[in-house]
Amino acid sequence: SLNFLKRMNQGLHQLHPDAMLIAEDSTDFDGVTRPVEFGGLGFDYKWDMGWMNDTLNYFRSNPFFRGSGYHQITFSMMYYYKERYLLPFSHDETVHGKATIVQKMFGEYEQKFPQARALYLYMYTHPGKKLNFMGNELGQLREWTEEQEQDWDILKFPIHDAFYHYMHDLNQLYLQEPALSAWDYRREGFRWIDCHQENRCIYAYERRANRERLLIILHFSDLQNQQYTVTVPDCAALEPLLHSDWACYHGSVEKNTDLILTTPTEKGGQVTLPLAPYSAMLFRIHTTVEKSVSAPPVQAKKPRKPRTSTGKTRKTAETAQ
């Protein structure tokens, strides 16, 4: 069977060099994405089932106990460079009583959406290609079935409409920022800044490609009025690109994209930032202030809403749960 897979993948790559061959494999079999000529199976990408399970288990958990599961978020980078991984939120996770991605989040209806927004910013800034199943971008509450279309009418509710626009802007930003994808499979493309905040459920890391550098700060607890001090190597200022809790996304933070100057220290630029509960932030790192040219933050045109069906709509989104 291994020889069959190797010969099949070699042949497909020769006949269709633009085709992507992706393996769904939950084992630790070595070399799934290694070229056949180097002893591998020759797939282009492999689903990171470990990342998916650890991440969703973490977000299902009560925030009070997330400190004990803190390293469910950090563990994926311990093995990440062994394969060319793809991060999957597939249809398998929205069927057979498993609930949709938004529904998996801990808490009541209003609590689920800020966590889902933070989750997706984490996903999009984690190394690896992304797989998202249709309906995830709507914050859909009903499990998928092949017998009916997506619940487009749910976009009539402000929290879902804001979530849809958030996912649109996140996708646009992902396409615009090379640091989020160009060096996915190079070790120098990712660096932990802080992964020892178990009691506060805070994570900070850097993504880079060539001279482009981005800082990501995640806060996965429900603690209010938090201040976080972080030191970033070779950083003179931070430019906010996206905040999962901006008011335009149904959050609590007014949008502000002004440069944030850091205080020089021996280890780098230091800054103290306020953290909203269940939030994630993405910044561009500027090594100098005078010579840097700030690219404008994402101001994508408003996405067209998908065509809605003519069927009867629900009175409230929450009744769909």
Predicted feature residues:
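Non-heme Fe(II)/2-oxoglutarate
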Residues: W246
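A structural detector for beta-sheet-dominated domains
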Residues: L155, T231-P233, A276
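Intrinsically disordered, polybasic Lys/Arg-rich low-complexity tracts
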Residues: K291-Q321
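Conserved alpha/beta catalytic core and glycan-binding cleft of carbohydrate-active enzymes
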Residues: S1-E147, L175-P178, Y185-V230, D234-A237, ...
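Active-site rim elements
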Residues: V102-F113, D151-D161, K267-T272
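A residue-level signal for conserved active-site and pocket-lining positions in enzyme catalytic cores
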Residues: L170, L238, Y278
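Catalytic cores of secreted or luminal carbohydrate-active enzymes
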Residues: P158-L180
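C-terminal beta-strand-rich structural cap/linker in extracellular carbohydrate-active enzymes
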Residues: K255-A295
